[in-house]
Regions:
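Residues that form generic nucleotide/phosphate-binding pockets
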Residues: 16, 64, 85
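Generic structural hydrophobic/aromatic packing signal, biased to beta-strands
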Residues: 13, 44, 61, 82, ...
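Alpha-helical interaction elements in eukaryotic regulators
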Residues: 2, 6-9, 53-57, 61, ...
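Conserved, ordered domain cores of eukaryotic regulatory proteins
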Residues: 36-74
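Detector for Asparagine
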Residues: 3, 23, 37, 48, ...
């Protein structure tokens, strides 16, 4: 992949992250951005708030590291570190804490935004 392609993809991701909640259609629940590896990052509208999952945050960071020539060698350790940092974000202020198999988690799981329906935080977009 050429450097200009990578830089363009980084700019597109940056633009998506900055603008995904804008110009939302009333019937829309999820807006997706496809990363070069075929995975998606999603902006989710739920109960009039925009959200992003920890899984999607990890996906964004893995792509950015790869784009800058620093591929993640141990994805499990990398994820553990990111999720450890995300624990500092507080439910009700920075995130919603969803109970196992909640309606919201079920929707996120069906749309490949999360890997498990265990109790977890889903983060507010802004």
């Amino acid at each position: 992949m050429a450097n200009t392609d990578i830089l363009e993809q980084l700019e597109q991701l940056k633009y998506f992250l900055a603008t995904a909640p804008a110009n939302w259609r009333s019937e829309q629940a999820i807006r997706k951005f496809m990363l070069p590896n075929g995975e998606y990052v999603s902006c989710i509208l739920w109960k009039n708030l925009f959200h992003i999952t920890g899984t999607d945050i990890v996906r964004c960071l893995v792509f950015r590291f790869q784009a800058f020539g620093r591929p993640v060698k141990n994805i499990k350790k990398f994820e553990e570190g990111i999720f450890s940092d995300l624990r500092n974000l507080k439910p009700g202020i920075d995130a919603t804490l969803e109970e196992p198999r909640s309606e919201f988690l079920e929707m996120l799981y069906k749309n490949n935004c999360i890997r498990t329906q265990k109790k977890q935080k889903v983060f507010y977009w802004y």
